[in-house]
Curated annotation (Swiss-Prot):
UniProt keyword NADP, yes or no: no
Cited NCBIfam families: rplN_bact
Oligomer and partners: Part of the 50S ribosomal subunit. Forms a cluster with proteins L3 and L19. In the 70S ribosome, L14 and L19 interact and together make contacts with the 16S rRNA in bridges B5 and B8.
Native species: Lysinibacillus sphaericus (strain C3-41)
Record keywords, A-Z: Ribonucleoprotein, Ribosomal protein, RNA-binding, rRNA-binding
Family: Belongs to the universal ribosomal protein uL14 family.
GO BP annotation list: translation
UniProt entry tagged with the keyword Acyltransferase: no
Protein role: Binds to 23S rRNA. Forms part of two intersubunit bridges in the 70S ribosome.
Database matches in InterPro entries: Ribosomal_uL14, Ribosomal_uL14_bac-type, Ribosomal_uL14_CS, Ribosomal_uL14_sf
SUPFAM superfamilies reported for this sequence: Ribosomal protein L14
Gene Ontology cellular-component terms listed: cytosolic large ribosomal subunit
Gene: rplN
Protein name, UniProt field: Large ribosomal subunit protein uL14
Amino acid sequence: MILQESRMKVADNSGAREVLTIKVLGGSGRKTANIGDIVVCTVKKATPGGVVKKGDVVKAVIVRTKSGVRRKDGTYIKFDENACVIIRDDKSPRGTRIFGPVARELRDSNFMKIVSLAPEVL
């Protein structure tokens, strides 16, 4: 569960390493976001020479959360960290590589490009 002011690692090679959540998109007054949801973030840490710089305001989709998500068959999936992938307005990733596993719920949210780039889908 990602709230406003939550910090997340970035799981792609767009140049950002850590982001801070500004706003959860999808409805007025929405407080929390989970896997597959889009959030507006600002870049707090970045690598030199990357596509995005420190201080940039970007949109990102959440790919891993510590709190996890419940699936329809009753199982839960949790990860060791909160992570996101920076996306463009057309929901395509800004980076060309994805690091670490991503949840299968991204397939339901129509982020097929992220699922295809990921090394492992859990």
